[in-house]
C-alpha cells in the first residue's frame, strides 16, 4: 500500500484546513518545496498536492509553489484543486505532475473526463471522489450534490477511470480515523482502485486500511497527522509496506 503525504497549498504556503473550511486554517510552512523535500528524504515515493485556492476559485492558483516542489524532488506527485480546463491539466502535467485529480468538473461534465482519458490515459487522470453522508461533495466541499457517491464511482469507472481518491469530508482534518466501512463499500461496489483520504491519524488506521487491500484499497493520504506529529512518516511507510 502506498502512503501519500499531503501538501495543501494556500497563498503559496503549506497549510491544513479542517473539513475544507478556510476559517479553520493552520499554516505549517512558508516553503512547501522544503516540506516536499523532507517527505522525500524520509522515504516517501509519491506526494499528494492540493491547490486549495484553485479548488475554491476554479482554476490553478499556486503554480509557482507547485513548480518549486517539482524542482525540489525526484519522486512522483499528483495534483488536484480547480482543474476544470484542458489547458490547466496540460500545464500541471508539463510541470512534472505524474497524475492530476479531477473532482467537481467530473460531476457536472463527465465528457470532460472522457476527453482527458482519451488524451492522457487512465494512468494520469485520477478521480477525486469527495463524499458527505454518501453523496458527492463539490466546489471545494462547499456544496453537496444529489448524486450518490457509489453511483458516481460506477459512472466514472464505465468511462474508463481506474483510480479514485475517496475522501470522506466529514472526517477530514479531524484525526478521528477513516470511515473504513464506507471505503470498503466504495472499493468493492465500484471496482475502482481506491486511495483513502480523510481522518488517517494512527498506525492502527494504516493497518486497518492495509487489510482492505484485497478489496481494492491501494493507498492512503496522510496530512494533518504528519504535521501534528501523531504519526511519523517513516513508521507509516514501514507499516504500509509490511507483510502480515
UniProtKB/Swiss-Prot annotation:
Keyword set, alphabetical order: Amino-acid biosynthesis, Cytoplasm, Histidine biosynthesis, Isomerase
Highest taxon, organism lineage: Bacteria
Pfam family for this entry, one: His_biosynth
Gene Ontology CC: one annotated term: cytoplasm
EC id: 5.3.1.16
Signal peptide: none
This protein's pathway: Amino-acid biosynthesis; L-histidine biosynthesis; L-histidine from 5-phospho-alpha-D-ribose 1-diphosphate: step 4/9
GO MF: 1-(5-phosphoribosyl)-5-[(5-phosphoribosylamino)methylideneamino]imidazole-4-carboxamide isomerase activity
Main location per the UniProt record: cytoplasm
Localization, UniProt: Cytoplasm
GO biological process: L-histidine biosynthetic process; L-tryptophan biosynthetic process
Catalytic activity: 1-(5-phospho-beta-D-ribosyl)-5-[(5-phospho-beta-D-ribosylamino)methylideneamino]imidazole-4-carboxamide = 5-[(5-phospho-1-deoxy-D-ribulos-1-ylimino)methylamino]-1-(5-phospho-beta-D-ribosyl)imidazole-4-carboxamide
Active site (record annotation): 8 (proton acceptor), 130 (proton donor)
Family of the protein in this entry: Belongs to the HisA/HisF family.
Record protein name field: 1-(5-phosphoribosyl)-5-[(5-phosphoribosylamino)methylideneamino] imidazole-4-carboxamide isomerase
Encoding gene, per UniProt annotation: hisA
Amino acid at each position: 500500500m502506498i502512503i501519500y503525504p499531503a501538501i495543501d497549498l494556500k497563498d503559496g504556503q503549506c497549510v491544513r484546513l479542517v473539513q475544507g473550511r478556510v476559517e479553520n486554517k493552520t499554516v505549517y510552512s512558508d516553503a512547501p518545496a522544503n516540506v516536499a523535500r523532507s517527505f522525500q528524504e524520509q522515504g516517501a515515493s509519491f506526494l499528494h498536492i492540493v491547490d486549495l485556492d484553485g479548488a475554491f476559485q476554479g482554476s490553478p492558483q499556486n503554480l509557482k509553489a507547485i513548480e518549486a516542489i517539482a524542482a525540489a524532488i525526484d519522486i512522483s506527485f499528483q495534483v488536484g484543486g480547480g482543474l476544470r480546463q484542458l489547458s490547466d491539466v496540460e500545464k500541471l502535467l508539463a510541470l512534472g505532475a505524474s497524475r492530476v485529480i479531477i473532482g467537481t468538473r467530473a460531476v457536472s461534465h463527465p465528457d470532460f473526463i472522457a476527453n482527458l482519458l482519451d488524451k492522457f490515459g487512465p494512468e494520469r487522470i485520477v478521480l477525486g471522489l469527495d463524499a458527505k453522508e454518501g453523496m458527492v461533495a463539490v466546489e471545494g466541499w462547499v456544496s453537496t450534490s444529489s448524486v450518490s457517491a457509489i453511483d458516481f464511482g460506477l459512472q466514472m469507472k464505465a468511462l474508463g477511470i481506474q483510480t479514485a481518491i475517496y475522501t470522506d469530508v466529514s472526517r477530514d482534518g479531524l484525526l478521528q480515523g477513516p470511515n473504513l466501512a464506507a471505503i470498503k463499500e466504495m472499493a468493492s461496489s465500484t471496482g475502482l482502485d481506491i486511495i483513502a483520504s480523510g481522518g488517517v491519524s494512527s498506525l492502527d488506521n494504516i493497518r486497518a486500511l492495509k487489510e482492505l487491500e484485497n478489496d481494492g484499497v491501494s493507498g492512503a493520504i496522510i496530512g494533518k497527522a504528519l504535521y501534528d506529529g501523531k504519526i511519523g512518516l517513516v513508521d507509516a511507510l514501514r507499516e504500509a509496506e509490511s507483510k502480515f
